Amino acid sequence: MSYYTKAKFFTSAPDIRHLKNDTGIEVAFAGRSNAGKSSALNTLTRQRNLARTSKTPGRTQLINVFELEEELRLVDLPGYGFAKVPVAMKKKWQASLGEYLQKRKSLKGLVVLMDIRHPFKDLDQDLIHWAVESNIPVLALLTKADKLKSGKRKAQLLMAQEAALAFMGDVTVQTFSSLNKHGLPELERILDGWFGLDKKSDEEGAVVEGQD
């Protein structure tokens, strides 16, 4: 069973100023309003309704926090960039996202979700630049990979990996599909590293071996 099935709703906040508990480790998920962020979180946690998927992109305006265990959290940041959202609201969200990435001490990793057919749009790039400037590792997750045939999917991945070099930071690119769970093991492996779960399992294994 995956560790991430333990996720449960912890709190919501309109912006970083209302977020408490800036201790422990947080990993944030961010993306354009139609990038499949909620679906990816639900797939990761094996929970159909942990993150609510909206048929109207741009409706999720709150920062939603899910707790895995004490001091370990997944953070669902507001979707951005949807055309029908008022400009003033867009600017408010962008400012809030930037502030969170630059000031949140417990943030140890950022997953930026992008439709594999349209990666690295302006706001995606802004988000990654902010993270790199704050020395936060980034996973650029190319979602909806099931929409492309294998050859085209690999070509898009190579193109995105090439583009990611320009950020001059710790930016990994991976393809993903919530529909067929393509890329899920790779996503979990990266999250395990950010949360320190790989070290924890190694330490537990060493203890067991020492007891033999």
From Swiss-Prot:
A GO BP annotation: division septum assembly
Cofactor requirements of the protein: Mg(2+)
A GO CC term assigned to this protein in UniProt: cytosol
Record Gene3D superfamilies: P-loop containing nucleotide triphosphate hydrolases
Chain residues that bind GTP: 31-38, 58-62, 76-79, 143-146, 176-178
Residues involved in Mg(2+) binding: S38, T60
Domain EngB-type G: 23-197
GO molecular function: GTP binding; metal ion binding
Keyword terms: Cell cycle, Cell division, GTP-binding, Magnesium, Metal-binding, Nucleotide-binding, Septation
Family: Belongs to the TRAFAC class TrmE-Era-EngA-EngB-Septin-like GTPase superfamily. EngB GTPase family.
Described purpose of this protein according to its UniProt entry: Necessary for normal cell division and for the maintenance of normal septation.
UniProt-listed NCBIfam families: GTPase_YsxC
Protein name: Probable GTP-binding protein EngB
Lineage start: Bacteria, Pseudomonadati, Pseudomonadota, Gammaproteobacteria, Alteromonadales
